[in-house]
A protein has these predicted regions:
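Detector for Asparagine
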Residues: 9, 34, 58, 112, ...
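A mid-sequence interfacial segment
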Residues: 92-107, 206-217
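Acidic-enriched, low-complexity/disordered segments with a strong bias for Aspartate over Glutamate
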Residues: 2, 29, 69, 80, ...
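Acidic, Ser/Thr-rich low-complexity intrinsically disordered segments
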Residues: 172-230
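Amphipathic alpha-helical interface elements
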Residues: 1-101, 117-120, 152, 159-181, ...
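Short flexible/disordered coil segments
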Residues: 125-135, 193-201, 231-240
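Charge-enriched, short contiguous segments at helix-coil
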Residues: 18, 104-168
Length: 240
């Protein structure tokens, strides 16, 4: 179960509503309870739902950071286009079939081959959830192997998300370096509430931010203040 907990590093530090927080906590509890009691197929279903939540949060970040690209990605979503454009929560994406929503990952350069691999996880979930007389995950070893596969996929999607996170962080630095003009005078508060909470950032997202190369902003008139803001993020969140 220790390896399974790694998925938590790809889920947001905090959520915009108590309902979202409660939902994620419920899924973790369902996974842990079923895993501990040997109900591995049900544990897999909960873990899959946590994984799809990660995907929804990734797509949400694309929507927020690159709205133009997101709109282009809506081609073929005629029935759901309005709802997706006006979405106020990542979970609005759940109205679209999981296999279909994965197409948005093309916006972060995931090719058809990779998306096909990710879609296989959805197929596995469907087979496990239907009353077909089969127990696909009857042993801990079987589920652990599937968790390893899922985490590889999640890590791969995270790697593809790096340009989106870097873009989001760059904009944050440019727009929030002045303590007199931002919402919170203290840099740590601004980072926590506006960058991390406001963008559903995860531990792995913040790891990307902490490695951001400030050289691309060296000519900016406020590079010193930008550097200070970045240093606070590194000091508060950098690991390893």
């Amino acid at each position: 179960m220790d390896e399974a907990a790694e998925l938590g590093n790809y889920l947001p530090f905090s959520f915009k509503s108590p309902k979202e927080q409660e939902y994620i906590e419920f899924l973790w509890d369902a996974f842990e309870t079923n895993y501990t009691h040997g109900k591995y197929q049900f544990a897999f279903l909960a873990y899959h739902m946590l994984t799809m939540s990660c995907v929804y949060f990734n797509i949400w970040q694309i929507k927020q950071a690159r709205p133009g690209d997101f709109e282009k990605g809506l081609i073929g979503f005629a029935r759901d286009e309005k709802a997706l454009l006006e979405a106020t929560s990542p979970y609005v994406f759940s109205a679209v079939p999981e296999r279909t929503i994965l197409r948005f990952l093309k916006l972060i350069a995931c090719d058809n081959g990779k998306i096909g691999t990710y879609a296989k996880l959805v197929d596995d979930r469907n087979e496990s959830a239907h009353p077909n007389g089969n127990i696909f995950y009857s042993t801990q070893e079987a589920l652990d192997a599937k968790i390893t596969e899922i985490l590889r996929v999640v890590e791969e999607i995270q790697t593809h998300s790096k340009p989106v996170i870097e873009h989001c962080y760059r904009e944050f630095l440019l727009q929030n370096h002045d303590p007199e003009e931002r919402e919170y005078p203290e840099a740590a508060d601004q980072i926590r509430e506006v960058l991390i909470h406001g963008n559903y950032m995860s531990r792995r997202d913040v790891d990307i931010c902490s490695k951001f190369d400030l050289a691309c902003l060296k000519e900016h008139r406020a590079i010193e203040e930008i550097g200070t803001l970045h240093s606070v993020l590194v000091g508060e969140y950098q690991t390893g």
